[in-house]
Every structure is written in structure tokens, then in C-alpha cells.
């Protein structure tokens, strides 16, 4: 059965969709010593999903550094608490790796923020915003993309919480892991649709919907 996707997904339709939750293991990395084994484990995977979180700023001129780097395989997500560890040699090795595909969204911005912590040469990263256009999707937010491609909602309730808090709560950990892991799912499905053409694109144009085979 061919999948129906939309060039622009109606944000109002997201509310009624079932919520997506990362079903795997979540491992929080708090110390420099833990980063080496975590990175070795991650780089043994064939693909990784990546994202970052930063403590929100509510006052003019207030800026915070990236507090969390989340990196997920298909079943395990590591949450690197950069506000505790900084960018260790192992984390730098992960970020500079050129052998394993790392999938993110709006990742160019994340790289700029990470490089404010420490300079590094970005390795093999693929930004979903650079490839969704290949199947006719114009939306660029993770929530809209996932709703469009999979019919599930990624909750954003935890986005503006304090990511520098001493102990992340379960909702924060689940949110962070889901964001990184979902990038793998999106990349693999976008690539499948692009290669097979197994989809119908519904184009919304000036209030009209035009189905494209």
C-alpha cells in the first residue's frame, strides 16, 4: 500500500495523533571516564541519530552553552551531559568520525553551538532538512516531519525545561532520547520512499489539494 504524504502537514492535525516514545535503553553519561566506552559502543553501530539540548534563556543577553548531547542507535540512547563532562577527547572523536552516518535535524545550528564549547572538525553528519525535499516535503520541523511520514506525534512539552538541572527527570530523558532516535527512523523511511517511489504526494496549493502520483 502506497504511503500518502503531504508537502505541508497541517499542524492542527498533530494534536490527535498517538504520541511517539523511545522504546529502548537510556543511559546518562555524567563523567569523562564514562564517555570512552559509550563512544566505542556508538561507533560500532551502522547509523546514529543525534540531537542537542540547551537550557532556555528567558532574559535578554542571557546565553547558555549546550547542556546535553543525545546520540542514539536503533535501541539504545546515550545522553551526554556536557555541562558536567565538557567535550572530552572521546566525544570529540565521535563528532569527528567519518565512518558512521549520524542523522540530525537543523544540525548545522547544533554544530555551531557545540563548537562554542570546543572546536572540532565535523565528521559524517546528514541533516534531514537537506533531504526531505527529495520526496516533496517542504516542512522542516521534526514534529511535523514525523507526523507526516509516520502519523505519530513527538511531544515538545519538555523542550523549555532546565537541561542543566542536577538530575534529569524521566520525562526529560524520554524526550531527549525520542528526538535523537526518531531521526534514524525518518532518514531510513525517507530514503526508502525516495528509492522506491512508493508514495503519493498531496500538494496543498492556495487552499486546494492536488494529488501527485
Where are the model-predicted features located?
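Conserved DEDDh/DEDDy metal-dependent 3′-5′ exonuclease domain
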Residues: 23-30, 34-36, 43-47, 56-156, ...
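N-terminal accessory regions of nucleic-acid-interacting proteins
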Residues: 1-48, 117, 128, 181, ...
Amino acid at each position: 500500500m502506497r504511503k500518502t504524504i503531504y508537502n505541508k502537514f497541517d499542524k492542527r492535525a498533530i494534536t490527535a495523533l498517538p504520541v511517539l516514545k523511545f522504546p529502548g535503553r537510556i543511559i546518562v553519561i555524567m563523567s569523562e571516564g564514562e564517555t570512552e566506552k559509550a563512544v566505542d559502543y556508538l561507533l560500532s553501530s551502522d547509523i546514529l541519530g543525534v540531537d542537542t539540548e540547551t537550557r532556555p534563556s528567558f532574559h535578554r543577553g542571557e546565553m547558555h552553552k549546550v547542556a546535553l548531547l543525545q546520540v542514539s542507535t536503533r535501541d539504545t540512547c546515550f545522553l551526554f551531559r556536557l555541562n558536567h563532562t565538557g567535550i572530552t577527547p572521546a566525544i570529540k572523536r565521535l563528532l569527528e568520525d567519518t565512518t558512521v552516518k549520524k542523522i540530525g535535524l537543523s544540525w548545522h545550528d547544533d554544530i555551531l553551538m557545540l563548537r562554542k564549547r570546543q572546536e572540532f572538525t565535523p565528521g559524517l553528519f546528514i541533516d534531514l532538512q537537506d533531504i526531505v525535499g527529495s520526496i516533496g516535503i517542504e516542512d522542516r520541523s521534526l514534529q511535523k516531519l514525523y507526523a507526516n511520514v509516520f502519523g505519530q506525534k513527538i511531544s515538545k512539552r519538555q523542550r523549555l525545561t532546565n537541561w542543566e538541572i542536577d538530575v534529569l527527570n524521566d520525562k526529560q530523558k524520554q524526550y531527549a532520547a525520542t528526538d535523537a532516535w526518531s531521526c534514524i527512523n525518518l532518514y531510513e523511511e525517507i530514503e526508502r520512499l525516495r528509492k522506491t517511489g512508493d508514495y503519493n504526494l498531496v500538494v496543498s496549493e492556495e487552499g486546494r489539494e492536488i494529488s501527485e502520483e
